[in-house]
Amino acid sequence: MKKILFAIAMLLTITACTSNSTESDTNNKGTDEVAFEVAKNYFFKNDQQIPESPKITTEEEFNKFFGMATVMGEDGKPTSIDFTKQFVLVIVLPVTDTATEINPVKVEVKSDSLFYTYEVKTGEKQTYSIQPVSIIILDKQYEDNEVKLISRRI
């Protein structure tokens, strides 16, 4: 039980360090940036396999992989996701004992593809294990686009 609570606390710490900004629409060489919101206060269920696809389009599928990590305070509730109007892109990394953050950089649309760029920042070895997770929320209008992930390590 302590391990689960500690993993939830670490997930919240990681998501708190993630950018809270929403990307805006701009034109750049045939691509348009897509607005997204970072979902907070969710944890990956440890009895699940890492999803093969980063795209989750239904609440049922989302709830299969993620649980709510409600904490006290003003920003303690999980970010609301309306799957009738939105879908999510998730990045779930394997369990590690190295401090790891996943930071969304941008999402761009070009033709029928979404290019999701994110950074993975690794730090010091820890005495405990975490499972790094990042969830971003996008408008349903992009749901049918093919998703291509672009990872940057720092």
Where are each of the predicted segments found?
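C-terminal motif of bacterial Sec signal peptides marking the signal peptidase cleavage site
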Residues: 13-16
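Acidic/polar, low-complexity intrinsically disordered N-terminal segments immediately downstream
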Residues: 23-81
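Extracytoplasmic electrostatic interaction patches
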Residues: 94-154
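Mature extracytoplasmic domains of secretory-pathway proteins
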Residues: 56, 60-115
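Intrinsically disordered, low-complexity segments enriched in polar/charged residues with Gly/Pro
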Residues: 1, 28-30, 41-42, 91-96, ...
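Sec-dependent signal peptide recognition
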Residues: 2-7
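Bacterial signal peptide processing site
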Residues: 18-21
